[in-house]
Regions:
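Secretory-pathway ectodomains
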Residues: 2-389
Length: 389
């Protein structure tokens, strides 16, 4: 055969280069179009991890990993992460399941174990590194976040079986124990066997009985912090016992941010049951002070120069000074006090749609960090991005 019919070396190299470029282009395209979508569960736990005070959060994620033909197509994930409360840094982040449900949360932490409920069931992790001790309780237990809860009377997680029986997992153990019948009966009408998008853990004040909604934020000394309605005052301002404390210029429809406490029907008082429980998750909601014990309050509103967004401002209740301004968010699903004072806010960044993937830690001196959870790098590896505000 003549050499003229043989492919030249440069032709072979050119063909290979084109193939590599095509495959590389496909890979880059899959990474560019695979931004992870993340939903953090608002039910969180607290633990000491590597000598850090930390918050444990459970979240669902879709996308962000390397899909076929280059990867495992591990698109849907339930994950749990530990975040340091002092600086917002990620301490660990592990995959719990390879499917994503509607709801998830860290129910309790005890004796180095974290109890995490998802729509796959109940799992138990080691808090120091996130290693999985128990993946799930077994096939006989419901696959529903709302099929699990904590009963402090018996110091245990209560778990609903497919047959309607209520079992207990004593905190600090992975054992299965019996539940006294009177306690089990109350939980049978509280726990929910089926997962549902309507069964979310809603920490909004819209779940609070309007008649029981506080008129202001009570301080330990008895004074009351309020934000007057527009029809009560033409000026946007923060009041302390009716006297101006701070102006709220540039903030539309400002409101105080309360700690919303959810009580499952099985543990609710007669008065709480009379106020009512949510139809889809069987919890009573009440609003109480947030930050006031440590001399601060949060105010939420819409910045006048950024319509449609939300902004949080932290105020000193003694001086009226603005200690922190948290902007660029599209709302928050929960604001809650951590055990030692800082306020934890789970929020969505502006323009991210339904993603609740920001863990904001607001310290009482105003120092604030925002941790972007569930993000992935170019190679699909999980990472967290921390911003100091």
């Amino acid at each position: 055969m003549s050499d003229k019919t043989q492919p030249k070396l440069w032709q072979v190299a050119g063909t290979l280069a084109i193939a590599v470029m095509a495959v590389g282009g496909m890979f880059v395209m899959t990474r560019a179009t695979s931004r992870p979508m993340v939903s953090l569960g608002p039910v969180v736990g607290y633990a000491t991890v590597r000598d850090h005070d930390a918050v444990l959060v459970a979240y669902g994620r879709s996308g962000g990993t390397i899909g076929p033909p280059f990867g495992s197509n591990d698109t849907w994930q339930e994950r749990v992460a530990a975040i340091a409360l002092d600086d917002g840094e990620l301490l660990w982040d592990i995959q719990l399941h390879d499917t994503e449900g509607w709801e998830r949360g860290v129910l309790a932490v005890a004796d180095g174990l974290a109890y995490v409920a998802t729509d796959e069931g109940l799992s138990v992790l080691q808090v120091d590194d996130g290693s999985i001790v128990v993946g799930d309780l077994g096939d006989g237990y419901v696959e529903s976040f709302n099929g699990y809860n904590v009963d402090p009377r018996i110091d245990a997680v209560v778990a609903l079986t497919d047959s309607g029986q209520v079992d207990a997992v004593p905190l600090g153990t992975t054992d299965i124990a019996a539940v006294p019948e009177d306690i089990a009966e109350a939980w049978r009408t509280t726990l929910i066997a089926e997962s549902s998008p309507t069964g979310d853990s809603d920490f909004g004040t819209n779940q609070v009985d309007p008649a029981a909604m506080p008129t202001g934020m009570a301080l330990p000394g008895g004074q009351l912090i309020t934000v007057p309605k527009p029809y009560q005052s033409p000026d946007q301002q923060l009041l302390r016992d009716g006297k101006p404390l701070a102006r709220l210029d540039g903030l539309l429809r400002p409101e105080l941010v309360y700690e919303v406490v959810r009580t499952p029907a099985a543990l609710a008082t007669p008065g709480q049951l009379e106020e009512g429980t949510a139809m889809f998750n069987h919890h009573h909601s009440a609003a109480g002070p947030l930050g006031a014990e440590h001399g601060v309050v949060l105010v939420d509103g819409e910045p006048a120069d950024d319509p449609g967004a939300e902004e949080l401002r932290l105020f000193d209740v003694e001086t009226g000074d603005t200690l922190a301004v948290i902007g660029g968010i599209d709302g928050y699903v929960r604001a809650t006090a951590t055990p030692k004072g800082p306020i934890l806010v789970i929020a969505a960044a502006e323009g991210t749609g339904l993603d609740n993937d920001r863990v904001i830690i607001v310290r009482t001196d105003g120092r604030t960090t925002m941790t972007h959870i569930g993000d992935t790098d170019f190679w699909g590896r999980t990472r967290a991005n921390v911003t100091t505000l």
